[in-house]
């Protein structure tokens, strides 16, 4: 079943501009409170200008362009501007530092980068080492360094015409994005996402929350993540609704923003719900128009009930991952919800619980959650240049092994139990224990290291490191955290450490 009618992203935006014209498409609020608004017509023109900018810089169909940006209008311009000319977006987690960012540049084959002055010094060093294919950097800030190979994104964009200058033939099977996601190995894998994937995601996610063109979908989730892109942005645009993109999450500002923009749909992770609950009660707690809150694992029933009662909202559960593109299991619109179930398989999908021998299990039995979709259409196409990793999780007939455990009941409701992967879920982010261990182990004083997740009342899990030092060495807590801070931002830096004489358990699987 082809629900997108063979329409790629360039056609989508041209049609949206024609149909919705001056209706508000995008509202972006910066951390400083600056608000930018664009109608569907204006947004399509900005996307065209951005596509023309890339063309003048030598970008053609199939070229990869990396984005290292926080939530901002430029992210949206670049995402769809690249898609219009058949180029490929490579979003980089804005919290990553040098080593991980450089690795993604190398392995994605990105030749151009769009970033801000905040991140430029790091990429200047990477560019000088000439270890990647990166040949040019566009900065979204007004002020520019006096360096070769650097230009102003805004200045170049504003010089471009509002009509598209380069329109190569496109197919819905063409790659639109390579999104690198943390895995159980030491390095993230590039998830290949097609035009069809994104178009399908828009229709599917709009169906999941019964989105209409008079809705306002507000998100504070990072644009470099699949949920912001496919559950929120693509859903809003596909429905002709208004998409509100807030740069940074603030528990104190959240409800005021929801009221100001008259949001009707939003999305939350457990960390957000918990931080919203610790805010002082206010008479304005229910002064909003939200009818659905898209929710992603994991929350206790007590926390769920308290949140819904205080703020007068309903949680719509959705389970998925980067490889599934959308929440392939979840609550359905106008259907009964059964807490703590993660819902039922959505349309176009099949779901099973399988044992260690890949055999389906009956209701009530715990096993691996497996999903059947169509690669490149309803689930990801493949891991970029990694057929071995692709074959490990994706069967030839479209069955995807999620690596998560769960069970189902007799009525087809699924229940999440745990992640089989050696992962830590911290504040909505997947953090690989192996990745952290391998890098921390490079410290000259450290003989061995084990990283584990421990329960955290706000972020689900905190990161704890058990360190074994080389004989005769000493390492202070301050020195250890200073070393970690140089490698990672707050996302992956352990919050707790402990120096051990002997490490009995090695989390690397030894």
Curated annotation (Swiss-Prot):
Gene3D superfamilies per UniProt: 3.30.300.30, N-terminal domain of ligase-like (3.40.50.12780)
Extent of the signal sequence: none
Pathway terms, separated by semicolons: Amine and polyamine metabolism; carnitine metabolism
Domain of life of the native organism: Bacteria
GO biological process entries: carnitine metabolic process; fatty acid metabolic process
A Pfam family that the UniProt record links to this protein: AMP-binding_C
Matches recorded under SUPFAM superfamilies: Acetyl-CoA synthetase-like
InterPro entries membership: AMP-bd_C, AMP-bd_C_sf, AMP-binding_CS, AMP-dep_synth/lig_dom, ANL_N_sf, CaiC
GO-annotated molecular function: carnitine-CoA ligase activity; crotonobetaine-CoA ligase activity; medium-chain fatty acid-CoA ligase activity
Catalysed reactions, semicolon-separated: 4-(trimethylamino)butanoate + ATP + CoA = 4-(trimethylamino)butanoyl-CoA + AMP + diphosphate; crotonobetaine + ATP + CoA = crotonobetainyl-CoA + AMP + diphosphate; (R)-carnitine + ATP + CoA = (R)-carnitinyl-CoA + AMP + diphosphate
Swiss-Prot/TrEMBL keywords: Ligase
EC number: 6.2.1.48
UniProt xrefs under CDD domains: FACL_DitJ_like
Function: Catalyzes the transfer of CoA to carnitine, generating the initial carnitinyl-CoA needed for the CaiB reaction cycle. Also has activity toward crotonobetaine and gamma-butyrobetaine.
Family note: Belongs to the ATP-dependent AMP-binding enzyme family.
HAMAP family for this protein: CaiC (MF_01524)
Protein name: Crotonobetaine/carnitine--CoA ligase
Lineage, highest ranks first: Bacteria, Pseudomonadati, Pseudomonadota, Gammaproteobacteria, Enterobacterales
Gene: caiC
């Amino acid at each position: 079943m082809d629900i997108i009618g063979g329409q790629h992203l360039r056609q989508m935006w041209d049609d949206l501009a024609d149909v919705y014209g001056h209706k508000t498409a995008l509202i972006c609020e910066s951390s400083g409170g600056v608000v930018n608004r664009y109608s569907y017509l204006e947004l399509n023109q900005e996307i065209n200008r951005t596509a023309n900018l890339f063309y003048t810089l030598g970008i053609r169909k199939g070229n990869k362009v990396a984005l290292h940006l926080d939530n901002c209008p430029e992210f949206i311009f670049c995402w769809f501007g690249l898609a219009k000319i058949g180029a490929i977006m490579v979003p980089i987690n804005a919290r990553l530092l040098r080593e991980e960012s450089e690795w993604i540049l190398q392995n994605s084959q990105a030749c151009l980068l769009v970033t801000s002055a905040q991140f430029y010094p790091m990429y200047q060093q990477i560019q000088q080492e000439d270890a990647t294919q990166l040949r040019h950097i566009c900065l979204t800030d007004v002020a520019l360094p006096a360096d070769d190979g650097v230009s102003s994104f805004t200045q170049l964009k504003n010089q471009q015409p509002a009509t598209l200058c380069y329109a190569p033939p496109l197919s819905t099977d063409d790659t639109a994005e390579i999104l690198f996601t943390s895995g159980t190995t030491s390095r993230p894998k590039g998830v290949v996402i097609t035009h069809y994937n994104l178009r399908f995601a828009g229709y599917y996610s709009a169906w999941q929350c019964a989105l209409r063109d008079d809705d306002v979908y507000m998100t504070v989730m990072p644009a470099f993540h699949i949920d912001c892109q496919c559950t929120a942005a693509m859903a809003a645009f596909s429905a002709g609704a208004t998409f509100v993109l807030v740069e940074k999450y603030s528990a104190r500002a959240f409800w005021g923003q929801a009221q100001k923009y008259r949001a009707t749909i939003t999305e939350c992770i457990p960390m957000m719900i918990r931080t919203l609950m610790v805010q002082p009660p206010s008479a304005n707690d229910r002064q909003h128009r939200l009818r659905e809150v898209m929710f992603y694992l994991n929350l206790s029933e007590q926390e769920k009930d308290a949140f819904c009662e205080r703020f007068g909202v309903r949680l719509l559960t959705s389970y998925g991952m980067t490889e599934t593109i959308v929440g392939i299991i979840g609550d359905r619109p106008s259907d009964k919800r059964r807490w703590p179930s993660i819902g039922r398989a959505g349309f176009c999908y099949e779901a099973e619980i399988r044992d260690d021998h890949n055999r389906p299990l009956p209701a009530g039995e715990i096993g691996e959650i497996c999903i059947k979709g169509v690669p490149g259409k309803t689930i990801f196409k493949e891991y970029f240049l990694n057929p071995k990793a692709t074959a490990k999780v994706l069967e030839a007939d479209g069955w995807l092994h999620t690596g998560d455990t769960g069970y189902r009941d007799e009525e087809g409701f699924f229940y999440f139990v745990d992640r089989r992967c050696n992962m830590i879920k911290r504040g909505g982010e997947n953090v690989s224990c192996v990745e952290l261990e391998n890098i921390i182990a490079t410290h000259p004083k450290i003989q061995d290291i084990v990283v584990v997740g421990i329960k955290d009342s706000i972020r689900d899990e905190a990161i704890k490191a058990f360190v074994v030092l080389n004989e005769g060495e000493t390492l202070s807590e301050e020195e250890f955290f200073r070393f970690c801070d140089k490698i990672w931002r707050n996302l992956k830096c352990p919050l707790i450490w402990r120096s051990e004489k002997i490490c009995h358990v090695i989390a690397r699987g030894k």
